[in-house]
Amino acid sequence: MEITTTQQTSRVSVTVVHIKGDIDSTTVKHTQAKIEKVVESGARDLVLDLTEVGYLSSAGIRMLSSLFNLLRGTPPPESDPDGMLKSPHLKLVSSTPRVTDVLKISGLDLILDYYGNVAQAVASF
């Protein structure tokens, strides 16, 4: 597992977290801790680059959900049928069909936008 970060600028400063390797029960704690450390250091808008992630397990799904909640803060009091619950602070990049399918099947695509490349994700902020 290799995790690196870069800074890019769109309308706001965006931290891109590049993840290389599988996200599963053996790697998720390390991965989540590294990303949470980035948030604790002041990063507010994140792109998780999953283009080099070959496998995303249920542990990885829980991690993404936790990061969504961390960046969202206090949950809104009501459900929003218009999709306003999508995260304005966390975007994903996934070019592998296997990982994209997991995002769709798990329903994470309802709360997290994902893009085909980092440039598109950064430009979405």
Positions of predicted regions on the chain:
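Amphipathic alpha-helical interaction surfaces in cytosolic regulatory modules
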Residues: 25-111
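Short acidic-hydrophobic, aromatic-tinged amphipathic segments that line or gate anion-handling sites
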Residues: 112-117
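STAS-typified acidic loop motif
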Residues: 1-33, 50-55
